[in-house]
């Protein structure tokens, strides 16, 4: 049985899981002391983390791990491969207790261009700072082998471990090997390939490894055309295959880029409740190894520039960062010793800034969801403020009233009014109206009658008036409501309209005279609220209309039977619920309710219907 603290922790964790994004990323589990005890990657963060808490685990590591979780952090990335690389970096950095299978410091391989007179190129898992160049790491090994194979086919490179110094080559210490005879090596060991020619190939290879393949591709196209002009189609086809390999090759990752080292990245987002969120990423040796988002509560209406400056100072102090470059989203009036501030517009640094912005926006959205779950009224007020801003109202529309008509060719004409208070339906305030003064199908006249009756009475009884009236219809409905509200009753109540598309779905919000379309995203919470209001008034009106029509039909069927009074009708409808069921019932079943004589009368009367 869970203790009270455990129950609170479980509720807190469920809240985090419920708001996780369905995006690739890395998640971190922390214990009660704030220590990271597990790091994992996911193609879909929400599904992966949810799986830990949605079932009973068998006794063992996973069950123990779940029991130790007190908090969850996560970092959003753009691809599953990025998540793999980031997971690897974080596991090596924090060495979490429950990542036992990944604690051997095994890392993803990189491609090394060795710092030698005639450089060798090979894959390695060790980064040695001896002037060599490293590209990667590669989490997808087939991609790495494809690149190495491409290089092998494009350029004849040495693969031996010989010390090919100028002195040793001049001394004639070496002989060509099999690689030379099968044309996989040009024989630099015996002076058959010059140092300059070899390094020219190395420079081109480095461009391929960096992903800068445009010049290489252009060179291959020219070579391919040359061979084709010389009628050497077989060789041209081989060059074409190499060209296609290069074009399809993508060697860089957004999360890990070997050209970036010791850089801090910051971004900031604000909300409407005096909060600001700052995201911090730290890049070391081409990889993200720190990621953190935190919240500031404004006290003196500080600007984004002031808050971001505070965040930079605090994070660099907390994580002991000595980065010489800081990437930020906008210019800052901040000077730090030996530090350059960069506002990137393109390239790898811009991708890192975009990744930071992605994380801070996601964090902001998650905090908003959590706050609104704990305090639903906060969500309601946010939506009402959105309506206020979109329609330029003087105040949030705390009380919204919406009208709709319902009839079939003018028969059984009714109308309905639903009331939403603080963005929630207030069903005790709903009202139904039988149309009294309109003959035939006239929606505009019916709307005028109902609006007039409702607000004349509100004025007479000194009842609260709505902050916004919404009509279930377009410009015509809005205009007839305006005529009653402004011209007849001399009231000042904003009027909006909800128009539907040809599939009878809410499509747009109209406001103003003449009416203008207010652009609202159909996936937004505000649009869903407006759709809810329109669906609710339609449901309420049509249900009332059906009930009225049904009662009229029932009344006419039983009223036409002589000798059957109100008491008998009530007894029959109470038992059988409808005229149709009375018709289907046997004589004996009806007789049990009203006696045999009346039962025969009813049976005979309904059979003539």
Swiss-Prot record:
Pfam families: GIY-YIG, HHH_5, UvrC_RNaseH, UvrC_RNaseH_dom. GO terms for cellular component: cytoplasm; excinuclease repair complex. GO terms for biological process: DNA damage response; nucleotide-excision repair; SOS response. It comes from the Bacteria. It is found in: Cytoplasm. InterPro entries: GIY-YIG_endonuc (IPR000305), GIY-YIG_endonuc_sf (IPR035901), GIY-YIG_UvrC_Cho (IPR047296), RuvA_2-like (IPR010994), UVR_dom_sf (IPR036876), UvrABC_protein_C (IPR050066), UvrC (IPR004791), UvrC_RNase_H_dom (IPR001162). Its main location: cytoplasm. One of its GO terms (molecular function) is DNA binding. Belongs to the UvrC family. The UvrABC repair system catalyzes the recognition and processing of DNA lesions. UvrC both incises the 5' and 3' sides of the lesion. The N-terminal half is responsible for the 3' incision and the C-terminal half is responsible for the 5' incision. Interacts with UvrB in an incision complex. This is UvrABC system protein C. The lineage of its organism: Bacteria, Pseudomonadati, Bacteroidota, Bacteroidia, Bacteroidales. The gene is uvrC.
């Amino acid at each position: 049985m869970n203790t009270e603290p455990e129950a609170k922790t479980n509720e807190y964790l469920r809240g985090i899981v419920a708001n996780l994004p369905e995006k690739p990323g890395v998640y971190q589990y922390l214990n009660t002391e704030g220590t990271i005890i597990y790091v994992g990657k996911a193609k879909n963060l929400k599904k992966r983390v949810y799986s830990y808490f949605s079932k009973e685990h068998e006794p063992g590591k996973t069950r123990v791990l779940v029991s130790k979780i007190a908090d969850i952090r996560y970092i959003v990335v753009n691809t599953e491969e990025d998540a793999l690389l980031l997971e690897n970096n974080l596991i090596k950095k924090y060495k979490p207790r429950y990542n036992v299978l990944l604690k051997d410091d095994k890392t993803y391989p990189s491609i090394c261009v060795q710092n030698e007179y005639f450089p060798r190129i090979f894959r390695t898992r060790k980064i040695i700072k001896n002037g060599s160049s490293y590209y990667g790491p590669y989490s997808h090994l087939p991609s790495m082998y494809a690149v190495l194979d491409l290089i092998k086919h494009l350029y004849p490179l040495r693969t031996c471990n010989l010390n090919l110094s100028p002195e040793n080559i001049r001394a004639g210490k070496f002989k060509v090997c099999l690689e030379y005879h099968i044309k996989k090596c040009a024989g630099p060991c015996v002076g058959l390939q010059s140092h300059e020619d070899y390094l020219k190939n190395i420079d081109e290879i480095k461009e391929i490894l960096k992903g800068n393949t445009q010049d290489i591709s252009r060179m291959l196209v020219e070579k391919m055309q040359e061979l084709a002009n010389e009628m050497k189609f077989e060789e041209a086809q081989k060059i074409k295959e190499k060209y296609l390999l290069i074009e399809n090759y993508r060697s860089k990752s957004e999360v890990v880029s070997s050209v970036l080292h010791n850089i801090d990245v910051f971004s900031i987002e604000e909300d409407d409740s005096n909060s600001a969120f700052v995201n911090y990423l730290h890049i070391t040796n081409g990889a993200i190894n720190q990621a953190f988002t935190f919240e500031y509560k404004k006290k003196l209406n500080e600007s984004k520039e002031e808050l971001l400056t505070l965040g930079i100072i605090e994070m660099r102090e907390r994580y002991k960062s000595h980065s010489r470059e800081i990437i930020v989203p906008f210019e800052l009036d901040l000077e730090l010793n030996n530090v350059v501030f960069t506002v990137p517009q393109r390239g790898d640094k811009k991708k890192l800034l975009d990744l930071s912005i992605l994380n801070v926006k996601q964090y902001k959205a998650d905090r908003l969801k959590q706050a609104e779950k704990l305090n639903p009224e906060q969500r309601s007020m946010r939506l009402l403020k959105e309506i206020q801003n979109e329609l330029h109202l003087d105040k949030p529309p705390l009380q919204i009233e919406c009208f709709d008509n319902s009839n079939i060719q003018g028969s059984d004409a009714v109308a309905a009014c639903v009331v939403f208070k603080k963005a929630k339906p207030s069903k005790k305030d709903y009202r139904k109206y039988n149309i009294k003064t309109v003959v035939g199908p006239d929606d505009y006249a019916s709307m005028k009658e109902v609006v007039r009756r409702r607000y004349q009475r509100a004025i007479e009884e000194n009842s609260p008036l709505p902050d916004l009236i919404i009509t279930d219809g377009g410009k015509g409905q809005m205009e007839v409501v305006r005529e009653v509200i402004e011209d007849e009753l001399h009231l000042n109540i904003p009027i909006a309209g909800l128009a539907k598309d040809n599939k009878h779905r809410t499509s747009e919000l109209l406001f103003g005279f003449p009416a203008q379309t207010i652009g609202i995203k159909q996936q937004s919470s505000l649009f869903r609220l407006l759709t809810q209001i329109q669906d609710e008034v339609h449901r309420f009106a049509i249900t009332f209309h059906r009930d009225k029509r049904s009662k009229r039909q029932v009344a006419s069927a039983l009223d036409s039977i002589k000798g059957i009074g109100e008491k008998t009708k009530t007894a029959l409808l109470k038992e059988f619920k409808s005229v149709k069921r009375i018709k289907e019932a046997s004589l004996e079943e009806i007789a049990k309710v009203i006696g045999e004589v009346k039962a025969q009368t009813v049976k005979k009367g309904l059979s003539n219907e």
